[in-house]
């Protein structure tokens, strides 16, 4: 993005910063949303938002669209990071939960490690790293379809937490 749009270092660094900014702004509201609509629907919403974010650069590779795309990626990441572990707790029994969470973190670390390598391979193979967007869009779409087809019985919350109660945990 930096080279494509001739951005300075400080402007180019806004892209990854936006992902973290959205996590800061939306993590507590996401937990409140999750309490209202459930973990599965929140994870599904995160995958749909991520898929939309990955589709935008395919339609229009412009600086403005990349800003929107990275913002949506940050929002999607926030939703999934807040809601995925509670969803897993509804699926995996208590004695296997810790190892399942650890395995999930390991897989996330591997994916983060492989991302730049895959981008480099796409660049070498096809001459353009932008082919990552449709590939990851397809992965997100398949994930959304798969999750929407599965029924998960979620534990009901006795009461919803207020914004201030969530904030007091920090």
What are these regions (language model features)?
Residues 1-10:
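Short amphipathic helix-loop junctions that connect adjacent transmembrane helices
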Residues 13-20:
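Short hydrophobic/aromatic, small-residue-rich stretches within specific transmembrane helices
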Residues 20-28, 113:
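Residue-level signature of mid-helix packing/kink "hotspots" within the transmembrane helices
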Residues 25-64:
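Conserved MFS/SLC helix-loop-helix module at the cytosolic interface between two early adjacent transmembrane helices
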Residues 53-57, 73, 147:
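MFS-fold secondary transporters
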Residues 69-106:
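Cytoplasmic helix-loop-helix junction between adjacent transmembrane helices
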Residues 100-152:
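Helix-loop-helix hairpin linking two adjacent transmembrane segments in secondary transporters
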Residues 154-170:
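Juxtamembrane intracellular "pre-TM" segments in multi-pass secondary transporters
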């Amino acid at each position: 993005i930096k080279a494509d749009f001739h951005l300075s270092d400080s402007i180019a660094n806004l892209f990854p910063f936006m992902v973290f900014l959205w996590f800061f702004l939306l993590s507590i509201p996401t937990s409140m949303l999750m309490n209202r609509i459930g973990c599965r629907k929140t994870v599904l919403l995160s995958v749909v938002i991520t898929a939309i974010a990955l589709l935008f650069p395919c339609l229009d590779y412009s600086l403005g669209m990349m800003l929107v795309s990275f913002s949506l990626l940050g929002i999607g990441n926030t939703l999934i990071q807040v809601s995925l572990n509670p969803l897993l707790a509804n699926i995996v029994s208590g004695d296997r939960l810790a190892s399942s969470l650890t395995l999930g973190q390991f897989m996330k670390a591997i994916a983060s490690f492989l991302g730049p390598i895959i981008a480099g391979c796409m660049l070498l193979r096809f001459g353009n790293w932008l082919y990552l967007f449709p590939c990851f869009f397809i992965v997100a779409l398949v994930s959304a379809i798969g999750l929407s087809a599965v029924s998960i019985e979620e534990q009901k919350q006795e009461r919803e937490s207020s914004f201030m109660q969530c904030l007091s945990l920090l």
